């Protein structure tokens, strides 16, 4: 079982199609206090998701007492009981974030558009923060990696999240929407951004 805060997810059943090898025994409950992607931020009982070059820091994260999701089977973690070898770390985090979202009793506002996403996101967050507790997308964490990571940083006492959704290719907004299942959607505008990928404004 995987426990993040007070929420419990059956990691074996939900992610059986992605997990290649689980170091811990099936009867053990894995308790996570935070999800991180930056190896420099890793602390004990964090879940370190190794993405791209992050696999090289898997052993370092384990030494700090973290649990590790990694997708490079050439790395020798010596069957460490806190390690999870998966097919794809990004897809694993996306599925984990979606499952986590379904445990949250919060309102999620998704914001997209060719321009103005960040400004509108910040305005909505500031407005809601005068009365409620919540979180928003930080920096450029508005893609297929950043959005699920942001979702996984939410806390049990949050009332809302404002998620910025970026797009650079076909189907990206659909993917982000499926992961986060926003209650409210805001489109700032539809312009000529990313035409090098999308070809026409209609797309």
Segment roles from a protein language model:
Residues 2-95:
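N-terminal leader/targeting and accessory segments in enzymes
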Residues 91-203:
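Phosphate-binding loop of NTP-binding sites
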